[in-house]
């Protein structure tokens, strides 16, 4: 009997439950859709070069990889001086506004600019700096030195006297003068290998300096401007033939012959233009725009590929000739006072690590749009490899870790060799109060001088036991695998890195003898 009652009770509950559910409104399903947006900073001017301030979303079109993309929003960003912000915004609002104020990074190329050219330009450079400060800009001055690499001369400042003192003390490099004199004294030997190699070293250091600069300034909020002041990179002088007529073409047609040490395979063919492309991609990834002023007498100034390329690809501008300072000042003030920030929906909803071409059009008649050429979304490993590549290009610039290195090539049968060597590493530099650095990553790269081949090895060095035992030095011996090496001279670059960001690099040379004809 109990079983029957129980069944009847459950049946009643079931009917009531169904009736109750039917009486309720059935809830609708909700699906969250996350739309990924990309930000573009663009400058729009009329035919006379004046900024157009009244554009709306419908005035713009954004194309990615040739396809029209939806625009989510368009905002006119107006940059203010520090003084204006502090005077007109209270408390927390002022702190927010200060993150995106009128600021410019000024990079003086004291590596490629000879001492005479820089000395002649000091007056114009001082006037440019002071005029920018008068307009409300704060300037961060940096210099690219032959030995020190990238050096910060002062943080963002509007102190006219201090900035003028720094500019007045700038010194150019004597090496370009010596190389030019050597080249001119032997016009029949202009393709001399040793001379060209010295010019190419300057060129590699230039690229390394730019690769150093980008991570240094990337944290500055918003659109970041770099004004590069230089007499130009030694591109023509680094070519296999310094006489472009003899080479059978102009500078641009020959520049692909310039090849750099690329142990990490960042580029397809290790060429100079490909490295510039990497610099442009990294700059665009971090919203950095290059402007260039090329120093030198009017009749001596030739178009510089690097300045032209980087400014064009990052949405900036490049100035040379008689009116370079006047025109440069006008455009730099204009572009760093107002710009449009466009948020659009990219083609891919996930970061794919590929380059995406971007083009921005304005429907306003006569409008001219300056924008970044495109973007690559890098992963952290990609960025780390680019920092290492910079160290391999200019070993002198990376001296954060102190060590000595030696190596030699030993025969390993036939035309094969192994490299054996030692690192002498002081350990005191890895002892910290809070935490010791216990592991280093050791890279060795071997570069064939004809740039046809690169060999790269990597190893982890464990310092923990030696540090615990209180040792002052570590002698680390290494041996490479068998390498097939032709007779000739090879550059060997040894790089040490640790997790706190420090990098130390040494550049060595080895000679592989030619055994042909020997008994």
Explain the meaning of each model-derived region.
Residues 9-10, 126:
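General helical structural elements
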